[in-house]
Curated annotation (Swiss-Prot):
Keyword terms: 4Fe-4S, Chlorophyll, Chloroplast, Chromophore, Electron transport, Iron, Iron-sulfur, Magnesium, Membrane, Metal-binding, Oxidoreductase, Photosynthesis, Photosystem I, Plastid, Thylakoid, Transmembrane, Transmembrane helix, Transport
Any Pfam family: PsaA_PsaB
This protein's encoding gene: psaB
Complex and partners: The PsaA/B heterodimer binds the P700 chlorophyll special pair and subsequent electron acceptors. PSI consists of a core antenna complex that captures photons, and an electron transfer chain that converts photonic excitation into a charge separation. The eukaryotic PSI reaction center is composed of at least 11 subunits.
Protein's name in the database: Photosystem I P700 chlorophyll a apoprotein A2
Family, per entry: Belongs to the PsaA/PsaB family.
Species name: Glycine max (Soybean)
Positions with a binding annotation for chlorophyll a B1: H654
Enzyme Commission number, as recorded: 1.97.1.12
Coiled coil residues, start to end: none
């Protein structure tokens, strides 16, 4: 009996129904709830699993390098990045007929292949890789790191190498090591790689271990560094006629502040990037020496927080009690980490297209679209997770006595005001934005398009102008040649920046109008509503006027029995569950907007977006319907083409998505009755009744069915849009 799954919960292991299996899977990673768990084992398990996570990441990235080296066309792509399609890997499928073999044989390959839309070719090229041998070397190195990570994970589970709880709670040492060691040293090392390998590579010099010490990255060597003439490193940058990867038009500078983009590659100057990483390294190396450890110098975070008492006393006791609250709650720490990572991931999406760092990636439109969408969806899931763990913190770890009248307690004290303000903002945005869209639809439907309400986003245009965009005619700050800001930066970084902002060949500061104004507010509605649901879930997690004892029921409960009305659907988990739908919805609008605006930009018919985006039918007809027409003809009565796989995935995504509703709209009793009928029939059917079950079949719990429904909804939604995005972009631009 003791060996039945799940071993971490004897109570569940003895459950005679199928609940044992599903609850076992659901709580497998909730280490806190396991039998015999101690704080020490909890920290050690999580620590060891981090090494497992690293091993998986290194193995996966190693696989990317290996498959491109083995089955890709990296060396051919390097010769002509703009016209050769990068191959991710070969496809071996015995079911392919001749038309499919021909359709998927591209990029100079001998057989069917997948095209890479991940940007790895551009990245590897930019950082100095040139041959398949380089890729194999990288793959082997990452495989080695993966093995080391696995060994480290195993080692830290052995009694002799298990760290103590005090080691895990030594926040100052951890911060110092992470700031200096992880961020500082790795940024410095990356600067070194860029200066010694990537920049020479961009100038036609092939630097590897065998000649690393004999090729100087800069003709003056280390002389200027030791004599304080650092400005020499910025002199003689690459010229505007520089051909990337060749000495033609190349300079000698290694650390510059040029601004703008390399004219040929349309990506940031490598020498600017190296300079940026050096500055980051310096900042983080300093930051990693700020906190007090064994040496008695530096800041104590606890002292810093305790000293932060707001003036005037109107904000209570400020940060008192926060240090111990955060340091003793893994959920609080995870919530903070997820919130930060979520913001960073969304920023990556925004900056990868507007300020592309990798050579030629800006001209690979499908990759640009795929990377933007990928990072925004990832950000959405990470951000909702931050609030989920924030809510679990309030339920499991929050101690009111420890946090009396500090910022946390005051958030809870003022939750009604916070939630109602968010609600008001959401309602205002929703009704006004929808009102404008629907009004415009009615005007077009009634044949009076001139009566649309079209609002110019003058404040946003003013901000763009302040940053140097001249087309709107605002004479302000960087768009005014007389301003001190303009004159101060004139000789340093501004020429490159101003050229980039005012050139129409990139995505920096796109021209905006009434359609942008409307969709911006639709997105704001989505963001505020998602935030409202998440914030309400976390702030009401401990209890509310309706259910003051909510925290005693845990993070996810369906209801408090039939006798207590209104207690269904109000667990913190339910808030997370509802918020994910809104999150997906919002990111849908974000990616629709980004994609449609860019498709019209790349095709040179921007007026289509400008004219059709001001009413709902325009979005449905001229974005969704028009761009799916090519996709759904991936296979038809006349044959198939290279979009057929995306056409199939588009269909399949819709099916997965629709399956979600089966779990979301029918409730537990229906399934329980159905299961009992099926079990009755099974037991009375010859042959079938030879198969017996150890666990009595029962329906999923309400919460579990919602999770399964949500998973299908999310996965189907993302698969559908991914297929649409990649097919509609690659179908137009190759």
């Amino acid at each position: 009996m003791a060996l039945r799954f799940p071993r971490f919960s004897q109570g569940l292991a003895q459950d005679p129904t199928t609940r044992r299996i599903w609850f076992g899977i659901a709580t497998a990673h909730d280490f806190e709830s396991h039998d015999d768990i101690t704080e020490e084992r909890l920290y050690q398990n999580i620590f060891a699993s981090h090494f497992g996570q690293l091993a998986i990441i290194f193995l996966w990235t190693s696989g990317n390098l290996f498959h491109v080296a083995w089955q890709g066309n990296f060396e051919a792509w390097v010769q002509d990045p703009l016209h050769v399609r990068p191959i991710a890997h070969a496809i071996w499928d015995p079911h392919f007929g001749q038309p499919a073999v021909e359709a998927f044989t591209r990029g100079g390959a001998l057989g069917p292949v997948n095209i890479a839309y991940s940007g790895v070719y551009q990245w590897w090229y930019t950082i100095g890789l040139r041959t398949n041998g380089d890729l194999y070397t990288g793959a082997l190195f990452l495989l080695f790191l993966s093995t080391i990570s696995l060994i480290a994970g195993w080692l830290h589970l052995q009694p002799k190498w298990k760290p103590s709880v005090s080691w895990f709670k030594n926040a100052e040492s951890r911060l110092n090591h992470h700031l200096s060691g992880l961020f500082g040293v790795s940024s410095l090392a990356w600067t070194g790689h860029l200066v010694h390998v990537a920049i020479p590579g961009s100038r036609g010099e092939y630097v590897r271990w065998n000649n690393l010490l004999s090729i100087l990255p800069h003709p003056e060597g280390l002389g200027p560094f030791f004599t304080g003439q650092w400005n020499l490193y910025a002199q003689n940058p690459d010229s505007n006629s520089h051909i990337f990867g060749t000495p033609q038009g190349a300079g000698t500078a290694i650390l510059t502040l040029l601004g703008g983009f390399h004219p040929q590659t349309q990506s940031l100057w490598l020498t600017d990037i190296a300079h940026h990483h050096l500055a980051i390294a310096f900042l983080f190396l300093v930051a990693g020496h700020m906190y007090r450890t064994n040496f008695g110098i530096g800041h104590s975070i606890k002292d810093l927080l305790e000293a932060h008492t707001p003036p005037g006393g109107r904000l209570g006791r400020g940060h008192k009690g926060l240090y111990d609250t955060i340091n003793n709650s893994i959920h609080f720490q995870l919530g903070l980490a997820l919130a930060s990572l979520g913001v960073i991931t969304s920023l990556v999406a925004q900056h990868m297209y507007s300020l592309p760092a990798y050579a030629f990636i800006a001209q690979d439109f499908t990759t640009q679209a795929a990377l933007y969408t990928h990072h925004q969806y990832i950000a959405g899931f990470i951000m909702t997770g931050a609030f989920a763990h924030g809510a679990i913190f309030f339920i499991r770890d929050y101690n009111p006595e420890q946090n009396e009248d500090n910022v946390l307690a005051r958030m809870l004290d003022h939750k009604e005001a916070i939630i109602s303000h968010l609600s008001w903002a959401s309602l205002f945005l929703g009704f006004h934005t929808l009102g404008l869209y629907v009004h415009n639809d009615v005007m077009l439907a009634f044949g009076t398009p001139e009566k649309q309400i079209l609002i110019e986003p003058i404040f946003a245009q003013w901000i763009q102008s302040a940053h140097g965009k001249t087309s709107y005619g605002f004479d302000i700050l960087l768009s005014s040649t007389n301003s001190p800001a303009f004159n101060a930066g004139r000789s340093i970084w501004l020429p490159g920046w101003l050229n980039a902002v005012n050139e129409n060949s990139n995505s920096l500061f796109l021209t905006i109008g009434p359609g942008d104004f409307l969709v911006h507010h639709a997105i704001a509605l989505g963001l505020h509503t998602t935030t409202l649901i998440l914030v309400k879930g976390a702030l009401d997690a401990r209890g509310s006027k309706l259910m003051p004892d909510k925290k005693d029921f845990g993070y996810s409960f369906p209801c408090d029995g039939p006798g207590r009305g209104g207690t269904c659907d109000i667990s913190a988990w339910d808030a997370f569950y509802l918020a994910v739908f809104w999150m997906l919805n919002t990111i849908g609008w974000v990616t629709f907007y980004w994609h449609w605006k860019h498709i019209t930009l790349w095709q040179g018919n921007v007026s289509q977006f400008n004219e059709s985006s001001t009413y709902l039918m325009g979005w449905l007809r001229d974005y969704l319907w028009l761009n799916s027409s090519q996709l759904i003809n991936g296979y038809n009565p006349f044959g198939m083409n290279s979009l057929s796989v995306w056409a199939w995935m588009f269909l399949f995504g819709h099916l997965v998505w629709a399956t979600g509703f089966m779990f979301l709209i029918s409730w537990r009793g229906y399934w329980q009755e159905l299961i009992e009928t099926l079990a009755w029939a099974h037991e009375r059917t010859p042959l079938a009744n030879l198969i017996r079950w150890r666990d009595k079949p029962v329906a999923l719990s309400i919460v579990q069915a919602r999770l399964v429904g949500l998973a299908h909804f999310s996965v189907g939604y993302i698969f559908t849009y991914a297929a649409f995005l990649i097919a509609s972009t690659s179908g137009k631009f190759g």
